[in-house]
From Swiss-Prot:
The gene is ABHD2. Its EC number is 3.1.1.23, 3.1.1.6, 3.1.1.79. Progesterone-dependent acylglycerol lipase that catalyzes hydrolysis of endocannabinoid arachidonoylglycerol (AG) from cell membrane. Acts as a progesterone receptor: progesterone-binding activates the acylglycerol lipase activity, mediating degradation of 1-arachidonoylglycerol (1AG) and 2-arachidonoylglycerol (2AG) to glycerol and arachidonic acid (AA). Also displays an ester hydrolase activity against acetyl ester, butanoate ester and hexadecanoate ester. It is a single-pass type II membrane protein. One of its GO terms (cellular component) is sperm plasma membrane. Residues 1-9 are cytoplasmic. GO terms for biological process: acylglycerol catabolic process; medium-chain fatty acid biosynthetic process; medium-chain fatty acid catabolic process; negative regulation of cell migration; response to progesterone; response to wounding; sperm capacitation; steroid hormone receptor signaling pathway. This is Monoacylglycerol lipase ABHD2.
């Protein structure tokens, strides 16, 4: 009898275990996918001014909820992973022309030029000069998607291909792109200004590209001539401050660091003959490079210390990060500047966001936009599971650029009216 009672109780025990297991799995899913996180408009940091009030009226995306895909879109890790593996879905293939520029040290810089597919909303000739993320180029899907959308909104687009990033373009000097070198971007901008003397510029940088474009604008006042505005998306602002956070396992940053370092190693080693070959006349700083340390490197900091800083002769990693970061130059930018980050970006530690917040509190030309979700260069939109081809980020950058163009047009018309009234008097 006791045996029969024990046997009858077993299914109830198993049912309880199953229920607990299901509950545990659901809890993990809810936590990992961040399903309880609300959707909301992005947090905005700015000074009250005529420009900021105009932007709030002209850019609905600044005040509307950003709604990511329901099931996975609130996870910064999944957004980042999808950007990293897919780039974008159903990405278009814009048609452009590749341009080559020989730099003073013999390096061959390339960029791709895409003509507008429609008239711009203000009727002017406007060129977006675009700097992609680390080791990226014009053929990356997120760049193709953004360029296609910008073209359809009347923008000419020039996209820098980072030195050494294109697999089919050989290096012609012992140097490749670094965290903050602005030489190639500056050469592209000068080409555009010379070739299209009537054009005005909208400067756009993604991730590492955001650091480069902000540093470029702040290096000298002349670099801001003909520039209407600048947009930086998902950059970290200070490599010196970021290096410690990149070695932490919080938000899996150490894992992302390893993956990016592995990709950088592959790129560097694919150019080993051009960079380190015996026949190459290279700077003294590269002579003592120990490639065995490169092979065993597991972080970007190790690669930067062993290889990248030596391209420009920096004596230490600290000096390299201090000099190459845009943080020292942000206060010298006087054109309208929009800085965009996602609160759940696993690559950019929240402590780094104090930099754009502080800047926006001091400068009327700066607006810092911080949505809850989006990951690192993700910002996918969609109803439940499948993302849309166009992202919230693509729309926001073009919407902001359109608003600035209209703002400048309004200022110009007001000035013309004042001149006419003065003449009549």
């Amino acid at each position: 009898m006791n045996a029969m009672m024990e046997t009858s109780e077993l299914p109830a025990v198993f049912d309880g275990v199953k229920l607990a297991a299901v509950a545990a799995v659901l809890y993990v899913i809810v936590r990992c996918l961040n399903l309880k996180s609300p959707t909301a408009p992005p947090d905005l940091y700015f000074q009250d001014s005529g420009l900021s009030r105009f932007l709030l009226k002209s850019c609905p995306l600044l005040t509307k909820e950003y709604i990511p895909p329901l099931i996975w879109g609130k996870s910064g890790h999944i957004q980042t992973a999808l950007y990293g593996k897919m780039g974008r879905v159903r990405s278009p293939h814009p048609y452009g022309h590749r341009k080559f520029i020989t730099m003073s040290d013999g390096a061959t810089s390339t960029f791709d030029l895409f003509e507008p597919l429609a008239e711009h909303c203000v009727g002017d000739d406007i060129t977006m000069v675009i700097c992609p993320g680390i080791a990226n180029h014009s053929e990356k899907q997120y760049i193709r998607t953004f360029v296609d959308y910008a073209q359809k909104n009347g923008y000419r687009c020039a996209v820098l291909n980072h030195l050494g990033a294109l697999p089919n373009i050989e290096l012609t000097s012992p140097r490749m792109f670094t965290y903050g070198c602005t030489w190639e971007f500056g050469a592209m901008v000068n080409y555009i200004k010379k070739t299209y003397p009537l054009t005005q510029l909208v400067v756009v940088g993604f991730s590492l590209g955001g650091n480069i474009v902000c540093k470029y604008l702040g290096e000298t006042q002349a670099n801001q001539e003909k520039v209407l505005c600048c947009v930086s998306v998902c950059q970290g602002y200070s490599a010196l401050r970021a290096q410690e956070t990149f070695m932490q396992w919080d938000q899996c940053r150490r894992f992302y660091n390893f993956l990016m370092a592995d990709n950088m190693k592959k790129i560097i080693l694919s150019h080993r003959q051009a960079l380190f070959g015996d026949h190459v006349k290279k700077p003294q700083s590269l002579e003592d490079t120990d490639l065995s340390r490169l092979y065993t490197a597991t972080s970007l900091m190790q690669i930067d210390d062993n290889v990248m800083r030596k391209f420009h002769g920096y004596n230490s990693l600290k000096e390299y990060y201090e000099e190459e970061s845009c943080m020292r130059y942000l206060h010298r930018i006087y054109v309208p500047l929009m800085l965009v980050n996602a609160a759940d970006d696993p690559l950019v530690h929240e402590s780094l966001l104090a930099i754009p917040k502080s800047l926006s509190e001091k400068r009327e030309n700066v607006m810092f936009v911080l949505p809850l979700h989006g990951g690192h260069l993700g910002f996918f939109e969609g109803s439940v599971l499948f993302p849309e081809p166009l992202t919230w980020m693509d729309k926001l950058v073009v919407e902001y650029a359109n608003a600035i163009c209209q703002w400048e047009r309004n200022k110009s018309q007001c000035s013309d009216t004042e001149l006419v009234e003065a003449d009549l008097e």
